[in-house]
Amino acid sequence: MIRSFYGAREGSLKTERFGYVAGGYRQVVCALAARLAGQGVELRSGHPVTVVGREASAMTIVTRAESVHCDRVILTCAAPLVAALCPDLGADERQALRRLRYQGIVCASLLLTRPLGGAYMTYITDENIPFTTVIEMSTLVGRERFGGLHLAYLPKYVPADDPVFEQDDAAVSAAFRAGLTRMFPDLQASDVVALRVTRSRHVLAVPTLHYQAQMPAMATGVPGLFVVNSAQIVNAALSVNDTIRLADASAGRLLAATAR
């Protein structure tokens, strides 16, 4: 994380250089989807995949509504999900995927009538506070983009098996509100206009001792099935830049491998 922020600095004096995408990354995703669709790519959202397997000479993707047959499948989901989706993988391969440790996140997004501490990012070391950082987006973007309100994020980074993932939104919201009031005693309930909780169990794989030996390979034991995910990012932070580098490198390797 420190390397990531230091790398975002500019010049020999390493002055701060920080930017944002107006409208959030949704704008980037929508623009990418439109460009792909314009090139003839068929995009299907809202089709949860239940099984990926091989039948005869083709790969099969099973959803709740249909089965799709194709030549090759590239899975970009987290390693434990790959193991769960692909019963044709060997037992050792599935176990290796399940063994990878992941860090997840639970995050509260708040709209407030007032600022909090005034800094863009405040790291928290007090174990009595139920989140690990206060990110005040309005210090970077400006409150005019939020109708005069202030946008803040309260992320909590936890292991993928942390009990917080079993708590409902109301419980997480109550705990985070209490923690925020502990940090900012003058904060009133009426200052919080809206609060929304989001969560993801598998955000990034945790590099452990001899991690590169455990890192999942792109090609699997199932012909036509490939894996490209964040567990293959090493010696770098899980940033947009590093993710794009992985995608570019993997695309080149896949095209070369499938052209043979």
Predicted segments with their positions:
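Active-site/ligand-binding neighborhood in enzyme catalytic cores
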Residues: M1-V51
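A short small-residue
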Residues: R9-L13, Y153-A160, V228-N229
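Generic structural signal for well-ordered, non-membrane alpha-helical segments
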Residues: V21, Y25, V29, D169, ...
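General small-molecule cofactor/ligand-binding pocket signal
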Residues: E42-R44, V193-R196, F226
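Mid-domain catalytic core of redox enzymes
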Residues: S45-E166, A170, A174-L187, T198, ...
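Short FAD-binding loop at a beta-strand-to-alpha-helix junction that anchors the flavin cofactor
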Residues: L151-P155, M218-A236, D242, L246
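Charged, often glycine-rich, active-site loop that binds/positions anionic groups
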Residues: H202-Q214
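Internal hydrophobic alpha-helix adjacent to the cofactor/substrate pocket in enzyme cavities
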Residues: T243-R260
